[in-house]
């Protein structure tokens, strides 16, 4: 079974022109056309933490959001949301608290794809770097708690080095896929956005989605990877 996973920090749908334009984000998602998508900064930061992507817009797409929000108007938890193809069955979904000096979290879901069960997580890690390693360890602890399953972790790791610093917390048992430079979208130099997979997956291909729309829609470009269950 081959699936395309994507991670996209949508910057609260505010583009490089300073306009909040959720339609533009939806257009980028359609261009990428992944099966499973992790979004970061999908909710406003203050007040009711309302989603920046109206449900009516999502209803017009091939994806549905998974129930990981703690607030009724939010799409995700601390801005982390998961979208999946409508034919994918959700077995379990939950928000995760992470050790932090600033508001950060992750989201976890277990899915049924025609009898094959997989786990996906979305995360947006600490900007300062002071708790990033602890946050990765907390995510891995939650995976252990839920039991062994083919797993993919996606998100904005805010880490410059591919195998340095906090990324060393993953150890040898994880495939670290860094599709390419995705930040800032106008002239990408940083590889903050990554996809991490257990050895259950066979890596096929990956990339950074760069188009006229994606270059303007957010300060990050979306990244994607095609993986096949081994």
Predicted feature descriptions by range:
Residues 53-62:
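Glycosyltransferases and closely related glycan-assembly transferases
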Residues 1-36, 44, 48, 64-230:
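Active-site regions of metal-assisted phosphoester/phosphodiester hydrolases
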